[in-house]
Every structure is written in structure tokens, then in C-alpha cells.
């Protein structure tokens, strides 16, 4: 008899363009979520539709505590629970079901417990098979030279291209497994335990469902015997390159709590009713709805240009085939040597990339699709709601610059920033602060594909400056005591430091001496896995200070979200932000709207600017933060507030590598950046690993010697990080 969880949920339907009540039945043994228009219809067996859970992915909205999604069979189904607790119950039960059936899908049903030695042996064997395959691949060229028929030539070329794609996937898999093995060994020596993200020789011990499903009959509990991670009789080349995604829910963390909408009737419960008879034989090959009224994201796969094809073999197992480009080859990994070896090349060709960060680069749009199998493997090791701060991400998804340098792009329009102090009226200064703030985000995105900047090393510094458009060569007096002492007093200067590693906190400061304006901020980035998305909470605040008026504008930052991480990733901002000036009483509320799944536009913002003690705003703003924003004033005037498409981006200026200190961002990451530029992923990974190992070694040394880390340019002041020598302090000292 099937063991079942049943209860009400709301489901989004395209027909009604809204939420509709449905009665859901989760069959744990069959791996099927069926739904009915009512409980009575369920009693009569009149099923409205069903969702297959084998290979499914659960997603949550970080800003809504009641909704969740299930993505499977190239469709995304949207559900809404009564509240956060109800959603938690369903998600946990669904995760357990998905995990169970995904393990079955992978054929991991043996009691063999692998060791690191077994793993290393299979890895070496896999590398040997890979070498044989590479040698055989060369024969295609001989075939093509001897082939005279066009039709036969096309067939050989197609076969060669497909084989190339497979070889590249296997290369990525071997590299990732080697890294996992090395990190697992290092962490076992350091901590006496194995990292969650790298379970090389760990044994997954499934746990019974949490209290909500504690009443489930005993036959539904996953078998207690250890689960084999790699069947010994399988040849390495037959191992799955990209395992079907599964969110591990055996250590479930609470999902985000935020205001949700909609309703859901009484709580779900677990029963084992006799009136429901769902055997595994009744599980359809694809999820379906009788009226096909379910909402699904049609662009979930088509954006990548190569939709995954799901094949069902005679045994009922599923696999995902993806197309990948073979144009960017990797060096063959050597499994007999550690990836910690030093780079033989590196800095001699530094001029090739010294200024590349100042250019947009869309040439890598295909790299995410190319490495999709590695991303799928990585995501299969993390669980929903998991904090990703300590997760080591694959090198190829990195953007070629540090996070500290990305923060510098807040000042890509330095003329807007310094013009704040030019305004004579406090009302106009507040409007100008909002204008600069809303213009500050679009320049931070380089290229059409979202990538992740480097995690800064503790103590890392980034320095740069901007020359204002109206600056003349006569303004040559240097700001010798400023953050960038080799530039003129009319320039906007910027400095950033990674002041903490755990938690990751960056502090940055900017100023313009002649305009008597400065900016100080700190941001703690906290990332979270949301299923098909990754959310980054930017915790912290900034302060714009107009020194001539003794005004300080406190502002907060929106959260960032990486969407469609399995196809073509894109970034959106979300959350409510505020700007307040305590001296003048002016304030602004700004909302970055995330795209709703049931329609709507991307990148929308709305903002209201208020006068002191007024509840009604004198200026309303709406538009897109990376496009055009329009302002409507209480006087009836309508105008373009900011047009980021027409605003010229002023390039930041950075010292050449040979002039930088060792701990400056571009100098620290030069080997990683260079190898990413030439697409040598192995060498980039080695260089990145050396930096991380050096940081760990320094941390161990400080711990052994009981030495506290001392920051270079910033100090902690309450809950904020403040620049040691701000313009305000220097001007005050000069008066005395």
C-alpha cells in the first residue's frame, strides 16, 4: 500500500491567470505528486494532473514565504501553501521523495562502501579511458580526409562534434572529482570531518521525515543500509556526467520568512488511506495536466538555444542530454599529481589582460551551457535554503575581477556623485542623491551572462580613481593624504578592503576633495541556494556625506538574485531600500521589484521621495534600474529622471600591475585572471587554489600564535566599518 501525504495547496493556472484551490496527494513510494479539484474528486479517482518527482528540482522565492516551485520535464509548476510552516512541511516531504527516487535513478542500490583509495583508483581508470577516447578522436580527421562523399562527410563531422562534446564533459567531471578528493582530504586533516559539498567517501544516511511526517508508516523510511556512491562494476566512462539535480533535504534549514500572499485551506496531513491506490506502475513518463492549464516558464530552456532532451529507457530511468560547445578545450587532467602544483606560465603576459576589466565582454556567453553538467553536479550536493558562503564554486563561472572591484562600479557616473554637493537646496540635494543611487547599479554588470566575481582574500585592497569630464590638465595638485595619493584633488578616488572573511564583509570609501563629498559603506554578502536561483543578501549600509552642509545620507542596498542558473543566467535586484538624511528630514523609499513568475517586466523599480514630516511624496519614480526611469513631481511635471542607456560610463583608472602592491586585487588574482582570459580552466583553478590555501595557512598561523588580524585601511565602529582617514577627519585636523 502506498504511503501518502495529502492536503490542500493553491496552484497557479494559466486559464484563470491566478491561484486555484487543489487537493494534492504525494505518493512517496511512486514518486508522484497528484492533484485533484477537490478531496471528493480524489476519493473518486478523478485526477486533474500530476507531477513526476524523479529528477525534479524544488525552488523557493526568497521574498515570499508561502510559494514554491517544482521544475521537471522542462516545465515549472507553481504552488502556494497556507503559510511558511505549511510550505516547510511540503518541501521537506517532497525533498525526501525526490532524493529517494533520484538515488534509484542513478542505480545506487548496492551495499558497497567506497573508500578514498577506491575513489582514486576509479578516477585514474577514468582518466585512462579518457586518454583512449582522445586518441580515437584523432581518427576522425583521417576519415574526413579520405571521405569524398558530401553526405558521408556530414555524418562524420556530426559524429566528431558529438564526441568532442562528450570528451569535454568527461574532462570537466574528472577535474571536479579531483578537486573534490583533494579538498576532502585537506578538510579531514584540518577538521576531522568531510565537507558537505565534497562527499567523496562519505556515506549518505537517509533520515526519516521530520515531525510533520513522523506518522508515516515504517515501510516508507529509506533503507538504513549505506548507499554506494559509485558502483564498482561500472566503467568510468559509463558514470553519469551530469547527475539529475536533487536537493538534499536531510538537514533541512528553515526557508526565508517574508510576507506571502494568497490563502490555503487547512493543514496537510499524512495518511495511508485505503481509497487511494497509486502503484509505481501508474506513474506516467511525463508530468501532465488534463487541461494543460499549469503555468510553466516557457523560456526556462529555450534561451540557451539547446533545450535538454529527456530520454526514458526501458528500465524507466531518465537522463538529461545537453549540447555543449567543443570549441574551448581543457588541458587533460593528470590524476597522479595534485592540483596544487605551481603554474609555469603566468605573469609574463600580464599586459594581455591588465585592462580587460574595463571592457564589456560577451564572448563567454556559451560557457555556462558548455559547463552545465558540472553546475548540475555541484547543485546536486547542496540543499534548499543552504548558505553558500563556504561552498567552493567551479572556476569557470567566475567573472574576471574581484568583488571589491565590482563595488567600484557604483561610481561609474562620478559626475552625478559630485554634483550632489553642487545643489544649493536640501531638497535638490536629496533628489540628486537618489539620482546617483539609481544610476549606480547598471554598470556593475559586464556582459549578458551573469557570472560571479572573485571572493576577496582577507586584507585584499582595491584602489582606483576617475577623472571628471570637465577636469582640466591645470588641476594637478595631488591629494597626498587621500586614499589614492597619486591623483589630483579634482578626481574621485576609491578604495576598498576585505575586512572580514567569515562572515565576508567588504568596506569601501570614495571621495572628491575639491567637492567636499565622501562616501563610506560596508556590505556583508550572504548567499542562499533557492533551487533554480541563487539569492545574495547585501547586509550593510552606506553614507553619503556633504561636508559643506554637514549632511549625511544613510542608504541601504538591494539584494541580488542569479536566475536561470541551468540555462543562461541573468541577474536581477530585489528588495526595499531607504535613503534618509537626519539633518534635513528628507527621505526616499526605493523598491527593486523582482520579476513575478505570472507575468510582468524584469528590473522594475519604484521610488518615492518625501519632504520632512510629509506622508505624501513630492516625487514618484518608476522604470528600470538598467534602463530608463521617469519622475513625476507633485507639481504635475513629468520628466526622464535617469536614462542609463544614454549616460556615458566613465572608465575607472587603475595602476599597472607592476606598480601595484602584492595585496591589491588585480595583483593577487593576476594568474587566475590571465588563465580565465585564455580559457585555461585547469591553470585558473590551480592559481585560485593556491590563493585560498595561502589564506588558510595564514589563518592557522595567526590562531597558533594567538594573533588578531589587523585591517589595513578601515576600522570597526559599532556595527559599521569606517575608513581610517576620511576627508571629514582630514579637513577637521587641518582647521586646528
Curated annotation (Swiss-Prot):
Domain PH: 2-99
Primary localization class, coarse: membrane
Residue numbers of N-acetylalanine PTMs: 2
Segments of skewed composition (Polar residues): 314-329, 336-347
Superkingdom of origin organism: Eukaryota
InterPro entries xrefs: OSBP_sf (IPR037239), Oxysterol-bd (IPR000648), Oxysterol-bd_CS (IPR018494), PH-like_dom_sf (IPR011993), PH_domain (IPR001849)
Transmembrane residue ranges: none
Tissue expression per record: Widely expressed.
Magnesium found in the keyword field: no
Example of a GO cellular component annotation carried by this entry: Golgi apparatus
Keywords: Acetylation, Endosome, Golgi apparatus, Lipid transport, Lipid-binding, Membrane, Phosphoprotein, Transport
Record PTM Phosphoserine, positions in chain: 306, 324-326, 329, 611
Physiological role: Interacts with OSBPL11 to function as lipid transfer proteins. Together they form a heterodimer that localizes at the ER-trans-Golgi membrane contact sites, and exchanges phosphatidylserine (1,2-diacyl-sn-glycero-3-phospho-L-serine, PS) for phosphatidylinositol-4-phosphate (1,2-diacyl-sn-glycero-3-phospho-(1D-myo-inositol 4-phosphate), PI(4)P) between the two organelles, a step that is critical for sphingomyelin synthesis in the Golgi complex.
Subunit structure comment from the entry: Heterodimer with OSBPL11. Interacts with OSBPL10.
Protein family according to the UniProt entry: Belongs to the OSBP family.
Protein name as catalogued: Oxysterol-binding protein-related protein 9
Lineage: Eukaryota, Metazoa, Chordata, Craniata, Vertebrata
Amino acid at each position: 500500500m502506498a504511503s501518502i501525504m495529502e492536503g490542500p495547496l493553491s496552484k497557479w493556472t494559466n486559464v484563470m491567470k491566478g491561484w486555484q484551490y487543489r487537493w494534492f496527494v504525494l505518493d512517496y513510494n511512486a514518486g508522484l505528486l497528484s492533484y485533484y479539484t477537490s478531496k471528493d474528486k480524489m476519493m473518486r479517482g478523478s485526477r486533474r494532473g500530476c507531477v513526476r518527482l524523479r529528477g525534479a528540482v524544488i525552488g523557493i522565492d526568497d521574498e515570499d514565504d508561502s510559494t514554491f516551485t517544482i521544475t521537471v520535464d522542462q516545465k515549472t509548476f507553481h504552488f502556494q501553501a497556507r503559510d511558511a510552516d505549511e510550505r516547510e512541511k511540503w518541501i521537506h516531504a517532497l525533498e525526501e521523495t525526490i532524493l529517494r527516487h533520484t538515488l534509484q535513478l542513478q542505480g545506487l542500490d548496492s551495499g558497497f562502501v567506497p573508500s578514498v583509495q577506491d575513489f582514486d583508483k576509479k578516477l585514474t581508470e577514468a582518466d585512462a579511458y579518457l586518454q583512449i577516447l582522445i586518441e580515437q578522436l584523432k581518427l576522425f580527421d583521417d576519415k574526413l580526409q579520405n571521405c569524398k562523399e558530401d553526405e558521408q562527410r556530414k555524418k562524420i563531422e556530426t559524429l566528431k562534434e558529438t564526441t568532442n562534446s562528450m570528451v569535454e564533459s568527461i574532462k570537466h567531471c574528472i577535474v571536479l572529482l579531483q578537486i573534490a578528493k583533494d579538498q576532502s582530504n585537506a578538510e579531514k586533516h584540518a577538521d576531522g570531518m568531510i565537507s558537505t559539498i565534497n562527499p567523496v567517501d562519505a556515506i549518505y544516511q537517509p533520515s526519516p521525515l521530520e515531525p510533520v511526517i513522523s506518522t508515516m508508516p515504517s515501510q516508507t523510511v529509506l533503507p538504513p543500509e549505506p548507499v554506494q556512491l559509485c558502483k564498482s562494476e561500472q566503467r568510468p566512462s559509463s558514470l553519469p556526467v551530469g547527475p539529475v539535480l536533487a536537493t538534499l533535504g536531510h538537514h533541512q534549514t528553515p526557508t526565508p520568512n517574508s510576507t506571502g500572499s494568497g490563502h490555503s485551506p487547512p493543514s496537510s496531513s499524512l495518511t495511508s488511506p485505503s481509497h487511494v491506490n497509486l502503484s509505481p506502475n501508474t506513474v506516467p513518463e511525463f508530468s501532465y495536466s488534463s487541461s494543460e492549464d499549469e503555468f510553466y516558464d516557457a523560456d526556462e530552456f529555450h534561451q540557451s538555444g539547446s533545450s535538454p532532451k529527456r530520454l526514458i529507457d526501458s528500465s524507466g530511468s531518465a537522463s538529461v542530454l545537453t549540447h555543449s560547445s567543443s570549441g574551448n578545450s581543457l588541458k587533460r587532467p593528470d590524476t597522479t599529481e595534485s592540483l596544487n602544483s605551481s603554474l609555469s606560465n603566468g605573469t609574463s603576459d600580464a599586459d594581455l589582460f591588465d585592462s580587460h576589466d574595463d571592457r564589456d565582454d560577451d564572448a563567454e556567453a556559451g560557457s555556462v551551457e558548455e559547463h552545465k553538467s558540472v553546475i548540475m553536479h555541484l547543485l546536486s550536493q547542496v540543499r534548499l535554503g543552504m548558505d553558500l558562503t563556504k561552498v567552493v564554486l567551479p572556476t569557470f563561472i567566475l567573472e574576471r575581477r574581484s568583488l571589491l572591484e565590482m563595488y567600484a562600479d557604483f561610481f561609474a557616473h562620478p559626475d552625478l556623485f559630485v554634483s550632489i554637493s553642487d545643489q544649493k537646496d536640501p531638497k535638490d540635494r536629496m533628489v540628486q542623491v537618489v539620482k546617483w543611487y539609481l544610476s549606480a547599479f547598471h554598470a556593475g554588470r559586464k556582459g549578458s551572462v551573469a557570472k560571479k566575481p572573485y571572493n576577496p582574500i582577507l586584507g585584499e585592497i582595491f584602489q582606483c580613481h576617475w577623472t571628471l569630464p570637465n577636469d582640466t590638465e591645470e588641476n594637478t595638485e595631488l591629494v597626498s593624504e587621500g586614499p589614492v595619493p597619486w591623483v589630483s584633488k579634482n578626481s574621485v578616488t576609491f578604495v576598498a578592503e576585505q575586512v572580514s572573511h567569515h562572515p565576508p564583509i567588504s568596506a569601501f570609501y570614495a571621495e572628491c576633495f575639491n567637492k567636499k563629498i565622501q562616501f563610506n559603506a560596508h556590505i556583508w554578502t550572504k548567499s542562499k541556494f533557492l533551487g533554480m536561483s541563487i539569492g545574495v543578501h547585501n547586509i550593510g549600509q552606506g553614507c553619503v556625506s556633504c561636508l559643506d552642509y554637514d549632511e549625511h545620507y544613510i542608504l541601504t542596498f538591494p539584494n541580488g538574485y542569479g536566475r536561470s542558473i541551468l540555462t543562461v543566467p541573468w541577474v536581477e535586484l530585489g528588495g526595499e531600500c531607504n535613503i534618509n538624511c537626519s539633518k534635513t528630514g528628507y527621505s526616499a523609499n526605493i523598491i527593486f521589484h523582482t520579476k513575478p513568475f505570472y507575468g510582468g517586466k524584469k528590473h522594475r523599480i519604484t521610488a518615492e521621495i518625501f519632504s520632512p514630516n510629509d506622508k505624501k511624496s513630492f516625487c514618484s519614480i518608476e522604470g528600470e534600474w538598467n534602463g530608463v526611469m521617469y519622475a513625476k513631481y507633485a507639481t504635475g511635471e513629468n520628466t526622464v529622471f535617469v536614462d542609463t542607456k544614454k549616460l556615458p560610463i566613465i572608465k575607472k583608472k587603475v595602476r599597472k600591475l607592476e606598480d601595484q602592491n602584492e595585496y591589491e586585487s588585480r595583483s593577487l588574482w593576476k594568474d587566475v585572471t590571465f588563465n580565465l582570459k585564455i580559457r585555461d580552466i585547469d591553470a585558473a583553478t590551480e592559481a585560485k587554489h593556491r590563493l585560498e590555501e595561502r589564506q588558510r595557512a595564514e589563518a592557522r598561523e595567526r590562531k597558533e600564535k594567538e594573533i588578531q588580524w589587523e585591517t589595513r585601511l578601515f576600522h570597526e565602529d559599532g556595527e559599521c566599518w569606517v575608513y581610517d582617514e576620511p576627508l571629514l577627519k582630514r579637513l577637521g585636523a587641518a582647521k586646528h
